[in-house]
Amino acid sequence: MTDLTAQELAQPSWQTRDHQDDPVIGELRNRFGPDAFTVQATRTGVPVVWVKREQLLEIVEFLRKLPKPYVMLYDLHGMDERLRTHRAGLPAADFSVFYHFISIERNRDIMLKVALSENDLHVPTLTKIFPNANWYERETWEMFGIDVVGHPHLTRIMMPQTWEGHPLRKDYPARATEFDPFELTKQKEDLEMESLTFKPEDWGMKRSTANEDFMFLNLGPNHPSAHGAFRIILQLDGEEIVDCVPDIGYHHRGAEKMGERQSWHSYIPYTDRIEYLGGCVNEMPYVLAVEKLAGIKVPERVEVIRVMLSELFRINSHLLYISTFIQDVGAMSPVFFAFTDRQKIYDVVEAITGFRMHPAWFRIGGVAHDLPKGWERLLREFLDWMPKRLKAYEQTALKNSVLIGRAKGVSAYNMEEALAWGTTGAGLRATGLDFDVRKWRPYSGYENFDFEIPIGDGVSCAYSRVMLKMEEMRQSMRILEQCLNNMPAGPFKADHPLTTPPPKERTLQHIETLITHFLQVSWGPVMPANESFQMIEATKGINSYYLTSDGSTMSYRTRVRTPSFPHLQQIPSVINGSLVSDLIVYLGSIDFVMSDVDR
């Protein structure tokens, strides 16, 4: 993480930059020539480079083999460019596909973009270079109709197999009322049921061998150990898992499409529901990305308040994860203890925000209101209460010999495998890599806090992942202690024209600010045309928002990258060859909710 200099970290995150000075731009030009690329200036904070489709695979291979390589395909998706008006200096395109890569050794990213015309919509698959490209490419085809040549199984992933059309195209309806009334006839019902029938041959699976007949078993989508509406089709030889196919999409709500019809301000409540246990943690990357577009620098008090709420929700989520993991292994009591502890967190959150699970409390340029009187006492009581409770969880359950025997060494993978599948969060850190965005790429003032990043001993297994989460809660309490003792004075909103809603006191004195308030609340603020990006360390891994503004009151394109999506894609590579009982332990150790997967 030494490649990012102090000077670079100190630069305002909302500066529009083309990153021509980034070493990777020079490396690419030395290899492919100075005229091979179009470098786009954005507020994403990373180099954005348009490349020719014919050179895409060669360039990706080059990045993968650099001395300090780009080893993770972090994200991949598309955009309908046909209605975008602010495209000066960019290659002509009806559609585009972007590829976001991370170099761990450099602590730097690069985003490649490919321009496509409507009558020639195809890109080559990256699955032979990055295996986690599989699901991302399926979703890109499904949402935009962009063909992926060479993909091993290009089929729908979020929508039913019988669905027609590509929902993220600009000419596709955004509201249910724009569709014709739906009528479920007997013929349609039979068709839907047939589409859910699993055909092993479609996935390259054999029904039998010369000596064995395989059994195919549906685990889910309503099995309690599936942790939501999630289905895994298992190919079994007795109790051994020969192969499996995760089936997602049952919780898909079109969160990215919603971003195109909500104002920048009114989309905030939707962010809470992306990962419904994370609360304010979900709001953080969105409001930071919007603030980059607007050029807003929030007061220090706002930064610390946001950190405080985020860490409260981090502990809240981890408590549920650890207790349900213990329940999956076979012990019931810790779940009930955990809900008692989580209630104490909700008491603090409700006193501050007025809500519990989904506060929708962060604002563009600040927070909804200042901290209430007495918040210090509530937080103090919680911080005094929790340490002994964590010790009890550890001693009575997590260090139990039965649990250790069921979890230690189960569903194990190393750092190279984690990076190849886009794994982040505790799953990656358990392999020994301390990649935590709060430390490596500080946001919202995290660089001012003293805390450690727990890591594992080189192999990420079910037991090491859960023990890391336990230590992460202790580190979150260290951060909360510092928030309590060092809360800065000052305003809870930035003094900026695009702060939404604007400061109320001004609307009572000036007609101009009253008009601004009315327009921003009714129509929403108008953001400058640009692109911005923000990643954060969420409760389950790295979460990010990649926003495209076309100079309107609404986002032109809202891309939500969640950690749980690649974590579930990784399942077959980890669990094949293990027992069904090991799969239950593995699922419990991942820490996911299906809203985070399906969006």
From Swiss-Prot:
Its main location: membrane. It is found in: Cell inner membrane. It is an enzyme of class 7 (translocase). Residues 213-599 are annotated as: NADH dehydrogenase I subunit D. Pfam families: Complex1_30kDa, Complex1_49kDa. InterPro entries: NADH_DH_suC, NADH_DH_suCD, NADH_Q_OxRdtase_suD, NADH_quin_OxRdtase_su_C/D-like, NADH_UbQ_OxRdtase_30kDa_su, NADH_UbQ_OxRdtase_49kDa_CS, NDH1_su_D/H, NiFe-Hase_large. Residues 1-189 are annotated as: NADH dehydrogenase I subunit C. NDH-1 shuttles electrons from NADH, via FMN and iron-sulfur (Fe-S) centers, to quinones in the respiratory chain. The immediate electron acceptor for the enzyme in this species is believed to be ubiquinone. Couples the redox reaction to proton translocation (for every two electrons transferred, four hydrogen ions are translocated across the cytoplasmic membrane), and thus conserves the redox energy in a proton gradient. In the N-terminal section; belongs to the complex I 30 kDa subunit family. This is NADH-quinone oxidoreductase subunit C/D. It comes from Erwinia tasmaniensis (strain DSM 17950 / CFBP 7177 / CIP 109463 / NCPPB 4357 / Et1/99). The gene is nuoC.
